[in-house]
């Protein structure tokens, strides 16, 4: 008689189907920050005041708008931040999600929490598990839904409302396992981000080397010899993708950034852009918003300028040329306007600029080298996205 051996894997988490629904205030304490007197604040001192800016995007940065006080009172010392405390920002912009950022403290030294932030301290739950719980979609949905208007377009979340949020938690043993796994994934994510940033720095250095050290025999031409401005208009009728422009490229608009509900004219015309066009925002060139269209046919805001690339240049080479910091700095000399936010570079001035261009053969060699680096960056980005997907699973 033969026996069939069936190997059943050990379940990492044994009771995930028995999650407990609890009130957030029953597993932690939440206290608001203190309204420190701005007149007592200095640029240097013994105790630093932690403001919302220090927690922006969930990244703890003490260098952002640093403020200090000396000799805090007994009352002020009640807001001293301790190891494993979780800080969260409570105030943001209406219809945006620029708040609700959380940071868990590691070895804080002489840090005091300012108003518009809250300090969350675990009482009946694993401290690291609580941190990840506060970053979950379930928590954030309740967080943003509970926000109420403040001054102007400001919105706030009440601590009393937060205390009544309902969350699901696992048993103590699984809390430790889950938090350890998520912590390990966070470390992988941070390492992966550093790898990508290092690759980008290497790429930029290589591009600068080509344009600054190898261009002595390149031909000087006006940008108008390379680019041709055009304006093709189209209404938004869902026959073509509506996209947005950034320094990182052209991407389809998401609901989060779609402000078309503010547009009253249903026949409003949008700019059409095609594959390999060069597009830029005249008012945001100072922020690097100039890019090549690698997405394909789409409509974009009519404030953007679109160019086709003439046959004497390779599209990717032109992209490398116009996205360099050195090029943007030269272009900004043509900025017009008195208000910084509205200062812009006209397309006619941009096209009048002189640039150095090599032969098509040299352009192709440069593009081939950068393509190798870009493929490396793309693969590293895919791995980063995989780690993030694994984390989202929890």
Locate the predicted segments by residue.
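Short amphipathic coiled-coil heptad-repeat segments
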Residues: 1-18, 184-187, 191-222, 382-394
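Non-catalytic DNA-recognition/assembly elements of restriction-modification systems
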Residues: 1-6, 12-34, 164, 169-172, ...
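Sequence-specific dsDNA recognition surfaces
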Residues: 25-38, 53-86, 108-109, 224-275
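A short beta-sheet element
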Residues: 51-52, 65, 69-72, 76-135, ...
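Short, surface-exposed secondary-structure boundary micro-motifs
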Residues: 92, 181-183, 187, 284, ...
């Amino acid at each position: 008689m033969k026996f069939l051996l069936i190997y059943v894997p050990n379940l990492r988490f044994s009771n995930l189907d028995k999650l407990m629904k609890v009130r957030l205030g029953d597993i932690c304490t939440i206290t608001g920050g203190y309204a420190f007197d701005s007149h007592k604040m200095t640029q240097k001192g013994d105790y630093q005041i932690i403001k919302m800016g220090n927690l922006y995007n969930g990244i703890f940065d003490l260098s952002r708008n640093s403020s200090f006080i000396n000799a805090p009172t007994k009352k002020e010392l009640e807001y001293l931040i301790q190891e494993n405390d979780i800080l969260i920002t409570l105030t943001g912009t209406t219809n945006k999600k620029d708040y609700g950022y959380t940071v868990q403290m590691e070895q804080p030294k002489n840090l005091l929490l300012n108003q518009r932030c809250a300090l969350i301290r675990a009482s009946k739950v694993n401290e690291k598990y609580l941190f990840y719980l506060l970053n979950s979609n379930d928590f954030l949905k309740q967080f943003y839904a509970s926000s109420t208007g403040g001054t102007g377009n400001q919105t706030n979340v009440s601590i009393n409302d937060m205390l009544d949020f309902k969350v699901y938690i696992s048993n103590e043993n699984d809390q430790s396992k889950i938090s350890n796994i998520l912590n390990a994934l966070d470390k992988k994510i941070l390492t992966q981000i550093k790898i990508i940033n290092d690759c980008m720095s290497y790429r930029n250095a290589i591009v600068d080397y080509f344009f600054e050290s190898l261009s002595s025999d390149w031909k000087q031409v006006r940008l108008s010899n390379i680019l041709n401005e055009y304006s093709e208009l189209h209404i938004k009728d869902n026959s073509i993708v509506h996209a947005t422009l950034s320094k990182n490229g052209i991407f389809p608009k998401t609901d989060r950034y779609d402000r078309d509900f503010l547009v009253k004219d249903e026949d409003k015309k949008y700019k059409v852009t095609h594959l390999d066009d060069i597009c830029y925002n005249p008012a945001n060139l100072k922020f690097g918003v100039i890019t090549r269209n690698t997405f394909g046919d789409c409509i974009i805001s009519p404030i953007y300028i679109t160019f086709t690339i003439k046959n004497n240049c390779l599209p990717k080479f032109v992209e490398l040329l116009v996205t360099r910091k050195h090029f943007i700095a030269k272009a900004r000399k043509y900025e017009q306007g008195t208000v910084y936010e509205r200062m812009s570079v006209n397309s006619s001035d941009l096209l009048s600029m002189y640039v150095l261009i090599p032969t098509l053969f040299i352009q192709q060699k440069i593009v081939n080298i950068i393509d190798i680096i870009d493929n490396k960056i793309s693969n590293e980005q895919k791995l980063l996205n995989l780690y993030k997907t694994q984390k989202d699973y929890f």
